[in-house]
């Protein structure tokens, strides 16, 4: 897993309080990791903070899985 | 109990009777306060009276840009915003059929839309910290209606709905949202009532007196504190018994 992937995973584990082994690329935040809609908003805010970039609403709507987040941040992370 | 040391509070309408009393009470409990209002010199005078732990942030709540800048300015000044007191409000009273569009728009903009924008910005900060206290000053007439105040009562009823929703959405994040619905409180706003109006009101109040800004401030201190219940949407009224 990429360095960004590891940081994404760490944030997801901390925010959702899930087992690290469940946080795989294909895991859906809502369907597999038990997040509700507010959790996903918070995750996006946490990603923005960690990676120093802005995630616009239309981009946030396409981030449904751990892999989606990693892919987006590999392209857009500033820190 | 009710110690607010280390907490940062933003109070709108701090130059008014109720807002001033709330800012003073939060400050007395140890909070750092950012006082906001339209009149810079009055705010400066108030700040000088309070002493340390005070920031002056003038803001015109009818301006979208001013409103959007206020919470970030408070965060920049205090490092955080733990408590938001959305207190500022205006009246443009008239008989319903004579209410002009601009009377409606002005009152909704300052009382309701600004409250929404400030609460939205503050909640974003608070949910990250897992602590926040949003307290909006509504009015008993938002529940009862009041002749001559179609715009004002609608704005205050709107605040109640907004705050109940906010409280329900963020309760799990440690952010509580509450309204205080004052009855007739002795302030410059109610000083404008004539004797006949005052008599009519007092006839309905079992305690036969107007409330005081300090009554409202005490409720605000409680709701801002760690001791306040974390269950959402408690609506407090302070009406000296009416209605």
From Swiss-Prot, chain A:
Pathway: Lipid metabolism; fatty acid biosynthesis. PROSITE patterns: CARRIER (PS50075), PHOSPHOPANTETHEINE (PS00012). Residues 2-77 form the Carrier domain. GO terms for cellular component: cytosol; membrane. It is found in: Cytoplasm. Transmembrane segments: none annotated. 4'-phosphopantetheine is transferred from CoA to a specific serine of apo-ACP by AcpS. This modification is essential for activity because fatty acids are bound in thioester linkage to the sulfhydryl of the prosthetic group. The keyword Lipid biosynthesis applies. Keywords: Cytoplasm, Fatty acid biosynthesis, Fatty acid metabolism, Lipid biosynthesis, Lipid metabolism, Phosphopantetheine, Phosphoprotein. One of its GO terms (molecular function) is acyl binding. It comes from the Bacteria. GO terms for biological process: lipid A biosynthetic process. The keyword Disulfide bond does not apply. It holds the Pfam family PP-binding. The modification O-(pantetheine 4'-phosphoryl)serine is found at residue 37. Belongs to the acyl carrier protein (ACP) family. Carrier of the growing fatty acid chain in fatty acid biosynthesis. This is Acyl carrier protein. The gene is acpP.
